[in-house]
């Protein structure tokens, strides 16, 4: 766990497979009461999510937060756009890096820190199919080497 990181509620493993993560940044999320209760119950899905900068504000889209069961009329739409809390300079930097360079902002994980839901946002570049195959091959080779070293060291 990184410094200051709390309980991890959800991770986006698909993002690390589909993208090369260049940089990460922590952002707060503007949530309603029933949404934060669902997040604390780990009823959140980051798989198809992405973030974008519009009018100097950061917005999170396509992240599914399941409706809170006891929330009845106060429940929000599960995949609504949610505002991200970042400093102005951070937003300007992210906007500059994503504009026209093939970079995108993907949510990597949601965790609770001091009672607040935080989002780890990744500045990412898409991988091609051959890049994915290369990383899978590299991972398998490292696994085989580790297995052989383990067997060698136990003899």
Swiss-Prot record:
<keyword id="KW-0963">Cytoplasm</keyword>
<protein>
    <recommendedName>
        <fullName>SsrA-binding protein</fullName>
    </recommendedName>
</protein>
<dbReference type="InterPro" id="IPR000037">
    <property type="entry name" value="SsrA-bd_prot"/>
</dbReference>
<comment type="function">
    <text>Required for rescue of stalled ribosomes mediated by trans-translation. Binds to transfer-messenger RNA (tmRNA), required for stable association of tmRNA with ribosomes. tmRNA and SmpB together mimic tRNA shape, replacing the anticodon stem-loop with SmpB. tmRNA is encoded by the ssrA gene; the 2 termini fold to resemble tRNA(Ala) and it encodes a 'tag peptide', a short internal open reading frame. During trans-translation Ala-aminoacylated tmRNA acts like a tRNA, entering the A-site of stalled ribosomes, displacing the stalled mRNA.</text>
</comment>
<dbReference type="InterPro" id="IPR023620">
    <property type="entry name" value="SmpB"/>
</dbReference>
<dbReference type="Pfam" id="PF01668">
    <property type="entry name" value="SmpB"/>
</dbReference>
<dbReference type="InterPro" id="IPR020081">
    <property type="entry name" value="SsrA-bd_prot_CS"/>
</dbReference>
<dbReference type="GO" id="GO:0003723">
    <property type="term" value="F:RNA binding"/>
</dbReference>
<dbReference type="GO" id="GO:0070929">
    <property type="term" value="P:trans-translation"/>
</dbReference>
<dbReference type="GO" id="GO:0005829">
    <property type="term" value="C:cytosol"/>
</dbReference>
<comment type="similarity">
    <text>Belongs to the SmpB family.</text>
</comment>
<keyword id="KW-0694">RNA-binding</keyword>
């Amino acid at each position: 766990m990184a410094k200051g990181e709390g309980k991890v509620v959800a991770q986006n493993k698909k993002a690390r497979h589909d993208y090369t993560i260049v940089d990460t940044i922590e952002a707060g999320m503007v949530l309603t009461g029933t949404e934060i209760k669902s997040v604390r119950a780990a009823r959140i899905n980051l798989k198809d999510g992405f973030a974008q900068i519009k009018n100097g504000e950061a917005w999170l889209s396509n992240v599914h937060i399941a409706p809170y069961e006891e929330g009845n009329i106060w429940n929000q739409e599960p995949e609504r756009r949610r505002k991200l809390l970042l400093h102005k300079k951070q937003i300007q930097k992210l906007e500059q890096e994503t504009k026209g360079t093939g970079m995108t902002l993907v949510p990597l994980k949601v965790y609770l820190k001091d009672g607040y839901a935080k989002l780890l946002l990744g500045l990412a570049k898409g991988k091609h199919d051959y890049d994915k195959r290369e990383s899978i091959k590299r991972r398998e080779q490292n696994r085989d080497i580790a297995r052989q070293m383990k067997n060698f060291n136990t003899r």
